[in-house]
Amino acid sequence: YEQRAALAQRSQGGADLGRCLRDGGGAWQDSKPLFDILNTWQTSVQLREHAMSTDFIAHLRAELDGLRAAGLYKAERVITTPQGATVKTADGREVINLCANNYLGLSAHPRVIEAAHEALRSHGYGMSSVRFICGTQDLHKTLEARVARFVGCEDAILYAAAFDANGGLFEPLLGEQDAVISDELNHASIIDGIRLCKASRWRYRHNDMADLERCLQEADAKGARFKLVFTDGVFSMDGTIAQLDAMRALCDRHDALLGIDECHASGFMGRTGRGTHEHRGVFGKVDVITGTFGKALGGASGGFTAARREVVELLRQRSRPYLFSNTLMPAIAGASIAVLDLLEASTALRDKLADNTRWFRHAIGAAGFEIKPGEHPIVPIMVYDAVKAQQLAARLLELGVYVVGFFFPVVAKGQARIRVQMSAVHERRHLETAVAAFAQAGRELGLVK
């Protein structure tokens, strides 16, 4: 009664209700006044809750209006087909798709789809459990072993999302006595994961080895117990490739661990598609590798971390996204095994992607556009002005080419661009049509002559 009375007195009409609840006899003798008071109190609480809800909704609307006014609102276009060289939009138009992470064209590959169907038939739709209770099937263990072999590590652990792989990495491994050193342009999942750990933090200028060494020297001077340098293997907005060979040398000099996120590299970077570490000649010499099944490796969802067996074992015990998230669905596990079968059997898809990338980079430059130099299938076409980037993307869609403009806060102010992504599923006719559309739209908007 005392607790109820105290709660009631915080609301309008609470004094009367409080007296009734404290009264062991009199107020309960006549129930009508009590129920009148209860009704009044309940109504006042409901009104207060409604007012709070209205204020909150008004706040959210103001936030959304601000995003629209600043040109930062991200609209979602609906497509009605699988990912491919072309897709159909909700209005039924078929457009050339230049903005998917479907680097190898495997998201709709017949063998991958059949493997997913077979896993559904043999292992079910979902596990309704986390891994350590009853959510581990033979498919999951097989995939972990295959991933570890593919990227050149002893063991691997699966996550429901690649974001979780990075989000659950740093806190279990690093403590207050340690240091983590991160590239300034690392992915949001790396940044968020680092924020969750207690290690001292350094951030070095993008791909700048001199500044990385400065950070390592400062961590040494502070007496850091363990040091972990972590970088994207490939940076998603620029397509720049981390200098892992130089980074490995620096880490060896300063007795530091090296970790990479391979989301935009696994499956196609390097001679056999093993990733950035193969591309840079340090395959088997990277301590921790995170990656995704949501891009080149099938395009669905899910992520992984690969490392020494002791690292993976500790993550199984302490990585919160792994411990408290449902298991990767069997169909994704089965399909991902089929993806690795394809990639280990042949480099044909990787080779075609490289050919498409070389051709498009040359052709779009010849059309008068400025692009970020490089060799990655991410091709940033620089527009610089955010409004112009949105106008260019909209006009290209009208011309039958689906791309997206990127601008602040996704990239720095004044660095707006169209990010084009090549795929092995593109044929030359798709790329020729796309370059012609870029040239037409660019002339109309005064971006090229």
What is each of the regions a protein language model found here?
Residues 169-188:
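Conserved PLP-anchoring active-site segment centered on the Schiff-base-forming lysine
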Residues 114, 118-162:
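Conserved N-terminal alpha-helix of the aminotransferase class I/II PLP-enzyme fold
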Residues 102, 202, 206-260, 423:
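Active-site phosphate-binding strand-loop segment of PLP-dependent enzymes
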Residues 254-257, 264, 269-375, 388:
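Active-site C-terminal subdomain of aminotransferase-like
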Residues 42, 46-49, 54, 110, ...:
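PLP-dependent enzyme catalytic core of the Aspartate aminotransferase-like
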Residues 56-125, 256:
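N-terminal "arm"/small-domain region of PLP-dependent enzymes with the aminotransferase-like
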